[in-house]
Amino acid sequence: MINEKADSLVNAFKELLSQESFGSQSEIVSALQQMGFTHVNQSKVSRMLTKFGAVRTRNTRMEMVYCLPNELSVPNTGSPLKNLVLDVDHNETLIVIKTSPGAAQLIARLLDSVGKSEGILGTIAGDDTIFVTPTTGNDIQILITNIQKLFESSL
């Protein structure tokens, strides 16, 4: 009986962290208590965060939230691109691509390999953001469409 309660607490805890919307331990405590785990307190949540290796990172809305390491999976060349690219935005002269953490350099390398023939002058990549500079004279909207098609294809 105790193991079943502990297992259900662990499952609820992991489910909450997968939502990537809890920025503080007290928010996690409140959510668990609302789910019926009334005995949970901040120190218990702190121990669980440590036990499962949870970290605080930015979600897609740029909020600092707790998440589990398996949700921060490191991208590799086998990862579908559409799962790694979160957003593509632009102004008149520059394209900004937001990716999952750690994926920007992988995707920038792909874009660089496509190169000038497709209208890409160059890229600069950080951990989760890529700046794409189009070649002179190219319609930026056409380039964005081509980039989005590239992400949709299963490479």
Swiss-Prot record:
Q: Key word NADP present in the record?
A: no
Question: What Gene Ontology terms describe where this protein resides (cellular component)?
Answer: cytoplasm
Keyword match Ligase: no
> What are the protein's UniProt keywords?
Amino-acid biosynthesis, Arginine biosynthesis, Cytoplasm, DNA-binding, Repressor, Transcription, Transcription regulation
What Pfam families is this protein classified in? Arg_repressor, Arg_repressor_C
Gene Ontology BP term (one): regulation of arginine biosynthetic process
- Protein task: Regulates arginine biosynthesis genes.
Query: Could you say which protein family the record assigns here?
Result: Belongs to the ArgR family.
What's the name of the protein? Answer: Arginine repressor
Recorded source organism is Histophilus somni (strain 2336)
